[in-house]
């Protein structure tokens, strides 16, 4: 029984003083508040709204606060309102959504709170967390230190902050996401932990991994060894240690154990070579480019490329060129430098091609030599597809067909490599993808593929794999290529320019089908599968009908033009 209630404002928060309470604590207060409490909150919130700064949407926040209090709602959503501060929060809420604001600190948190989503703010610290808290997401902030973590916490996401150390992890924790911080050590993992994201830190040593863990993302740390418990994880578990300087002994041991006939542990992804990133180039963009040209051209080339130094991904492209010069192909392949120089000249003449190529090169952020080589393959593909789309092959259908066949073969090889990766327990997927392209470059006439790679020996790709892959590519090419080519974007671009009337007729035929047949064909397909009224099934059926229609129309057009 509560005989009297006094409310005092202390600092920026509210403290309820309950007098003469018989066997009642603050955490067992009834959900509904007295009118005087409501009046207090409304007064505080009104004043907070009036004192807002330009850009803050405090009027919207005030309305949501008021409705939340009046209706005793459990969830309060103040996300994406450009708020710089928060007032006292309704005491009954269990979920607080404050994502994507400009908050640097938080007020005292309600005592029954279970879920906080506070990512994408500017928080430098967190207040004391209530004992009831089960889920905390404060990623993408500026937090340097975490408070004590409640025992009931099961999900903790504090990635992309400024943490140097973590507190003791609670026993119920199932998910820990702390990637992108400044951690050099980690406390013991709780026995119930299932998911771990620890990438992009400075961790030198891991504690033992609990058997419950099914996913551990540990990329780009300073790990030279792994705990033995990693090999005792379940067979369906996934561990990624790419970008760590694992010792030669560790690599050999892992490879020996994971390739054994009795191995039943997790799949482990690693990377060969120096794991340092190449985001900081050794040279400016202009200098990195001119290094590929003969001395008598360097001055003119430098002047041209200076104009591109502020384009998106220019720095990573410069770093990529630095690393490309140190690959096996650059050192051993005759004419490689001239090939790169000719490619760079084409980039300087086309803003669209340059933008595409800079974006492709941005993905090669690791300095592993074979990753750079695979990126060079992709850049060659980008160039040829761009040239085809721009009209280089408008008068040479044979050359366009040859290019299409190469792109088709590469696509099939990627499918084969993807399937191969799934079968390996200790794998660098870059080496697998590159191995199929490099080792079959001559037999499949892959002009875009480098002819040498450094780490084929660790790819896990066998001679039998290569024979099987070649046979599969040739079989699928014989049965599927013409259908694939009829849907290929560069071929459509050529048809629009060289067969404008036929293209227009094909498009008209497609639109007539959409108007007259599409809905009925989708409905028939859903009825046949017993999925009428299922929105997801309807979208999938619609995509299938559209693809079948385009396949039929564009295949007929392709056959007519190529006849």
Swiss-Prot record:
Residues 271-281 are annotated as: Linker. Residues 284-563 form the NEL domain. One of its GO terms (cellular component) is extracellular region. PROSITE patterns: LRR, NEL. It is found in: Secreted; Host cytoplasm. Residues 282-563 are annotated as: E3 ubiquitin-protein ligase catalytic domain. Keywords: Host cytoplasm, Leucine-rich repeat, Plasmid, Repeat, Secreted, Transferase, Ubl conjugation, Ubl conjugation pathway, Virulence. Belongs to the LRR-containing bacterial E3 ligase family. E3 ubiquitin-protein ligase effector that inhibits host cell innate immunity during bacterial infection by catalyzing 'Lys-48'-linked polyubiquitination and subsequent degradation of host RNF31/HOIP. Host RNF31/HOIP is the catalytic component of the LUBAC complex, which conjugates linear ('Met-1'-linked) polyubiquitin chains at the surface of bacteria invading the host cytosol to form the ubiquitin coat surrounding bacteria. The bacterial ubiquitin coat acts as an 'eat-me' signal for xenophagy and promotes NF-kappa-B activation. The LRR (leucine-rich repeat) domain forms a slightly curved solenoid and may mediate interaction with target proteins. NCBIfam families: IpaH_Shig. This is E3 ubiquitin-protein ligase IpaH2.5.
